[in-house]
Curated annotation (Swiss-Prot):
Domain of life from the UniProt record: Bacteria
Family, similarity comment: Belongs to the ABC transporter superfamily.
GO molecular function terms listed in the Swiss-Prot or TrEMBL record: ATP binding; ATP hydrolysis activity
Listed name of the protein: Uncharacterized ABC transporter ATP-binding protein YhcG
Disulfide-bond pairs as recorded: none
Coiled-coil boundaries: none
């Protein structure tokens, strides 16, 4: 599978959230979409998922223009809590199973066990860290072609972040899936990434292979990001 954003722009009224961005994503690769708050990361992810359509430009999947059907092929983790608070964890699992044919029930219970989440516990009684874990569990339990994670580490303590990174390593299909992680927690994901894309002020600043950054620039991804932001 290949996803292409071709000269994509998105406006909300007079505000331009994304401006003339072109990106190509291929199966079997993990991408870091990084940038400061308000750089257009979330809007870009939503256009990749078919949840938003561009004001101009095209989003294509295998050369076909993206439609709402793309949502069915995409596991999208929003930075917002989208849970029904009166549900238990098990209720939420059953809801996802009813909505997504690619939802893997056996895998979800393995993940719940690894994340130390009690299926019988009410969502409203989960800590912020455990709600973050549950969002990751529900995303990774799908056998989706595309996994889009919007700020998966936001507000979580280092121990929770480590458990999430370990789950990503264990449950992502590194041969078949496209994975995009939008974050400003760059150090947490550097070891996972194949490529990094920098957005700033709604525009693509750079896209580079992580290996090239290390070998040719002699920098970590965070150092490279900071050097690019200095000239923006």
């Amino acid at each position: 599978m290949e996803i292409k954003l071709e000269h994509v722009s998105k406006k909300y009224g007079r505000h331009t959230a994304v401006n003339d961005v072109s990106i190509t994503l291929s199966s079997g690769r993990i991408y870091g979409l990084i940038g400061p708050n308000g750089s257009g990361k979330s809007t870009t992810l939503k256009m990749m998922a078919g949840l938003l359509f561009p004001t101009s430009g095209f989003v294509k999947v295998d050369e076909e223009q993206v439609t709402r059907e793309m949502v069915r092929q995409t596991a999208y983790l929003t930075e917002l809590d989208m849970f029904y608070p009166h549900f238990t964890v098990k209720d939420m699992v059953n809801f996802y199973q009813s909505q997504f044919p690619d939802f893997h029930t056996e895998q979800v219970y393995k993940l719940l066990n690894e994340m130390q989440l009690n299926p019988e516990k009410k969502i409203k009684k989960l800590s912020k860290g455990n709600r973050g874990r549950l969002k990751i569990v529900l995303a990774l339990a799908r056998r989706a072609d595309v996994i889009l994670l919007d700020e998966p580490f936001s507000g979580l303590d280092p121990m929770v972040r480590d458990s999430i990174v370990n789950s990503l390593v264990s449950y992502i299909d590194f041969e078949q899936q496209i994975v995009v992680i939008a974050t400003h927690e760059i150090d947490e994901i550097e070891t996972l990434l194949d490529e990094v894309i920098i957005l700033a002020n709604g525009e693509k600043v750079a896209q580079r292979e992580v290996e090239d950054i290390r070998e040719q620039e002699g920098m970590s991804v965070l150092q490279w990001f900071k050097s690019k932001m200095e000239v923006c």
